[in-house]
Amino acid sequence: CMRRMTLYILLGIIISITIAGIAFLHQPSFGRLPKGERLERIKRSPNYREGEFRNIDTTILMTSHKSRLSGIWSFLFRKVEGLRPDEPIPAIKTALRKIPLEENALVWFGHSSYLLQVDEKRILVDPVFCMASPVSFVNKPFRGTEIYSPDDMPDIDYLVISHDHWDHLDYHTVKQLK
């Protein structure tokens, strides 16, 4: 009877973890697979072959002499000195809405995020102002760099997303800009 109870508890834990994992992966920030016209357009791309995109040039995924497993282990558990600054990064917040539209300007927000204002058009590129990851302990911004929010943005003419990695496409920022 004790063995059966232990089995039920273990099975319950496994089922709970599985359900939690599936629910986690179905967050809107993970996006969804393309379908319909979008999928057909993707399939017509010259780099799309055999169900996936192929790089024109060979891309080396592991650039060290380590095995994949030891590389992952090292990435997760190795202590790297100087990886994060000890002090907040100095930053000056610009009043973006007050920049005259006639004035050409470039405001860099960090990493790949910037606002380009040229010829009376405003182009926002890769905005990440909320969270660059669906989990709070990954991709934390450096202290001092999180000074802008989507509410600080002026009216945008064009929104450019270079690719769909979390550090270039912040779901919550894009939803708030909408």
What are these regions (language model features)?
Residues 44-45, 137-178:
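Active-site metal-binding motif and surrounding structural segment of the metallo-beta-lactamase
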Residues 3-133, 138-140:
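Metallo-beta-lactamase
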